[in-house]
From Swiss-Prot:
It comes from Rhizorhabdus wittichii (strain DSM 6014 / CCUG 31198 / JCM 15750 / NBRC 105917 / EY 4224 / RW1). This is ATP synthase subunit a. The chain crosses the membrane at residues 31-51, 64-84, 97-117, 126-146, 166-188, 201-223, 235-255. Pfam families: ATP-synt_A. HAMAP family: ATP_synth_a_bact (MF_01393).
Amino acid sequence: MAAESGKIDPMHQFMIEPLFGQGWSIAGHNIAFTNSAMWMVVTLAALLIFMIGGMKRDLVPGRWQAAVESFTGFVAGMMATNIGPEGKKFTPYVFSLFMFILIANIMGMMPTGVVGVHPFTVTSHLTVTGVLAVISFSIVLVVGFWRHGFHFFSLFVPHGTPGYMIPMIFVIELFSFLIRPFSLGLRLFVAMTAGHILMKVLAGFVINGINAGALTVAIVSIPSFILMIGITLLELLVCAIQAYVFALLTSLYLNDAINLH
């Protein structure tokens, strides 16, 4: 947390700062290695370690193997339910997407500040969530046109629509389809940003109350600290829910592309 004139800035946690390579550039664009890039690398490393550690095929699985199998089974079940047998082809992608978002969200909640390394939630930036959403949307488009050609546009005309309403319904459905990547990326970005701001604001109340004296500690700091614990637990739940929602919506969009409904 950054402080100016004794005040804590809840937005400082979202600042992207270069760690090294400040002078690196390509075509005039700076490509320094930032704290955001570092935490994405850490997230990918954690995901890789998690998967490698659980790739054993013991007859009696250990806790690590059981955890990996539980996550893969959960995503595979979701794909089978939402898409059907063909959903199995896309399970690796949706699983990777789900686990990356989940681990990135949780990494941003880790109390690494006690050892001098400030946590950074990469999913609190629209550039990251937007790219993930665009990748998913691009896959949906490729799958849809690859399987159905121009018949893919029939997705935007619900079965049984009266002929005179087709132009209007087509435009409405097409518009709702095109805003999917924006809503998908924006939802995750807003959820992670709002929760983290609230936690920092409450932390500021706690610290400023302590600095103000004993009476303020009792009136402000203690209630804020208790509330902050509750919000932190809720935010951990939000981390999992948002990863699930992102993966769920991706599977539903893939179902539209595959089954045209």
